[in-house]
Curated annotation (Swiss-Prot):
UniProt pathway: Porphyrin-containing compound metabolism; protoporphyrin-IX biosynthesis; protoporphyrinogen-IX from coproporphyrinogen-III (O2 route): step 1/1
Binding positions (a divalent metal cation): 96, 106, 145, 175
NCBIfam families according to UniProt: PRK05330.1
Catalytic site: 106
An annotated GO cellular component: cytoplasm
Family: Belongs to the aerobic coproporphyrinogen-III oxidase family.
Region (Important for dimerization): 240-275
Cleavable signal peptide: none
PANTHER family reported for this sequence: COPROPORPHYRINOGEN III OXIDASE, MITOCHONDRIAL, OXYGEN-DEPENDENT COPROPORPHYRINOGEN-III OXIDASE, MITOCHONDRIAL
Protein name: Oxygen-dependent coproporphyrinogen-III oxidase
InterPro entries: Coprogen_oxidase_aer, Coprogen_oxidase_aer_sf, Coprogen_oxidase_CS
UniProt keywords, alphabetically: Cytoplasm, Heme biosynthesis, Metal-binding, Oxidoreductase, Porphyrin biosynthesis
Catalytic activity: coproporphyrinogen III + O2 + 2 H(+) = protoporphyrinogen IX + 2 CO2 + 2 H2O
């Protein structure tokens, strides 16, 4: 089937609506929308919820941009695409809660199509979701990964293990030699076996995000926290910033295509701190995080998992 970019765009717009409505219902605060246009072609709508009852900042961005040539970040691993016109569209979101016991979450689904006269279009889907806890709860990690596994299952037994590993490999801070969080799913360059199959999988990932995240929010939102937990949360948010600015392909793509900087950097936490050579107290919950975020087979842990 010929790729239907219009159909994909309509799904993405609905997905942004659905996620914003769901997060607002949980938090009690509303998103503020900022529509924007890109001079070189395209635009989008950025929605941000600030200082809510649960979420310190939640940003849900839709963008649809197009241009006459693919940017370097997109052709680095596919040089045959150089010189093609392109369309890129997607929904990307990051949620930073107030409560340090609630993890930060990120999700993204996207579609690219590159064309030139006399040649078949080249297209692919990408996306995924990942979780960045500050204090580790095994039952949360198990739920997150089982939700990911279950949505992958209709598409093949090998899909979840493959995209889990890709997520673990991708969200890795090489300069720190540590994982960003506990991962989830990550896929890119998906264009087989056909458009309908790939589009259905992208939809499953997009729709699965709230199913994976909101039960964790509900479970942790009433936990009491203080200055110690807050300081650790702000310190660990620094890792989030480092990854996005140094390693993230999506950030590089947006900046290199002349995307809207405010929307691209919407994923940044509103407050963050760095402290030179800081080390957590041995045996503390903060020290336990480094072990908790090590790559493991979360779906195989028992149902009665407890705090790690």
């Amino acid at each position: 089937m010929k790729p239907d970019a219009h159909h994909v765009k309509q799904f993405l717009l609905r997905l942004q609506d659905d996620i914003c409505q769901t997060l607002s219902a949980v938090d009690g605060a509303n998103f503020v929308e900022d529509s924007w246009r890109r001079e070189a072609g395209g635009g989008g709508r950025s929605r941000v919820l600030r200082n809510g009852g649960i979420f310190e900042q939640a940003g849900v961005n839709f963008s649809h941009v197009h241009g006459d040539a693919m940017p370097a970040s997109a052709t680095a691993h596919r040089p045959e695409l150089a010189g093609r016109s392109f369309e890129a569209m997607g929904v990307s979101l990051v949620v930073h809660p107030h409560n340090p016991y609630i993890p930060t979450s990120h999700a993204n689904v996207r579609f690219f199509i590159a064309e030139k006269p006399g040649a078949d279009p080249v297209w692919w889907f990408g996306g995924g979701f990942d979780l960045t806890p500050y204090y580790g709860f095994e039952e949360d990690a198990v739920h997150w990964h089982r939700t990911a596994r279950d949505l992958c299952q209709p598409f093949g037994d090998d899909v979840y293990p493959r995209y889990k590993k890709w997520c673990d490999d991708y969200f890795f801070l090489k300069h720190r030699n540590e994982q960003r969080g506990i991962g989830g799913l990550f896929f890119d360059d998906l264009n087989t076996p056909d458009f309908d199959h790939c589009f259905a999988f992208m939809q499953a990932v997009g729709n699965g995000y709230t199913e994976a995240y909101l039960p964790i929010v509900e479970r942790r939102k009433a936990m009491v926290w203080g200055e110690r937990e807050r300081n650790f949360q702000l310190y660990r948010r620094g890792r989030y910033v480092e990854f996005n600015l140094v390693w993230d392909r999506g950030t590089l793509f947006g900046l290199q295509t002349g995307g809207r900087t405010e929307s691209i950097l919407m994923s940044m936490p509103p407050l963050v701190r760095w402290e030179y050579d800081w080390q957590p107290e041995a045996g503390s919950p903060e020290a336990a995080l480094s072990e908790f975020i090590q790559v493991r087979d979360w779906v195989s842990l028992p149902d009665n998992s407890s705090v790690s």
